[in-house]
């Protein structure tokens, strides 16, 4: 059986929910629920509200997605962190 086709879309994290789930607004204005991919959890990549992310959506359920990438650029709406760096 062939691997299913996935839609890749960009969005902005609106809200961080319990159990490492997120509410994301896509570029087209649709709000979906999402979770961090295993690779992001394994590498302890932190996702905060306001981050710009790339999602994968299944063709079968367009209300749930998997966050694959967190963009690090000036287009992110989160303010820069002040103070000393974390260790």
Swiss-Prot record:
Q: Does the keyword Calcium apply?
A: no
Task: Supply the HAMAP family for this chain.
Answer: IF_1 (MF_00075)
Query: Keywords assigned by UniProt?
Result: Cytoplasm, Initiation factor, Protein biosynthesis, RNA-binding, rRNA-binding
Quaternary structure note:
Component of the 30S ribosomal translation pre-initiation complex which assembles on the 30S ribosome in the order IF-2 and IF-3, IF-1 and N-formylmethionyl-tRNA(fMet); mRNA recruitment can occur at any time during PIC assembly.
Q: Which Gene3D superfamilies match?
A: Nucleic acid-binding proteins
User: What is the protein name given in its UniProt record?
Assistant: Translation initiation factor IF-1 2
- Assigned protein family: Belongs to the IF-1 family.
């Amino acid at each position: 059986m062939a691997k299913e086709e996935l839609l890749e879309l960009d969005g902005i994290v609106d809200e961080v929910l319990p159990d490492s789930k997120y509410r994301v607004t896509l570029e087209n204005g649709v709000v979906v629920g999402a979770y961090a991919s295993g690779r992001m959890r394994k590498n302890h990549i932190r996702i905060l509200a306001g981050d710009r992310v790339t999602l994968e959506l299944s063709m079968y359920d367009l209300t749930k997605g998997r966050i694959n990438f967190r963009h690090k650029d000036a287009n992110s709406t989160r303010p820069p962190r002040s103070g000393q760096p974390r260790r």
